[in-house]
């Protein structure tokens, strides 16, 4: 059953007059936007000295596989707010974002695994979210020719009867020749 909250979202007006300063302050205080380097800088990304592209410069990382001349790239993604507003498109967007991030490392996306986290499945609205997310994942994987090779489902994720936003976390892997080109997400020099 389509959740009732979506009717209210569809009628939201975006015609608010906001100053640039208010928009700037709200945007850059949002945890979805701010720098997350304090998280990924806490662990050793150079274990066994096989890291080609560690965390920080792209949203995907690569490690070499010494015996093969190849490298394995990986990205993990999900935007729960997008999935809350439109579960099918939000889940598809998570797959596509992972695919783009893997491609940015120079690798070809090969497969995904997922971790599907939802509220109480006895609630028809939660099951509708779950079904819609599965449809989005299926369609995006078909478009990218990336099979789902594993995953898990975690249900009953709620506090005081309020379920979590639909959270279809996607991890994608890709393979590349070690000498292949990768794209940088940052500028190599200042613009003029």
PLM segments and residue spans:
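Glycine/proline-enriched, intrinsically flexible loops and inter-domain linkers
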Residues: 1-182, 192
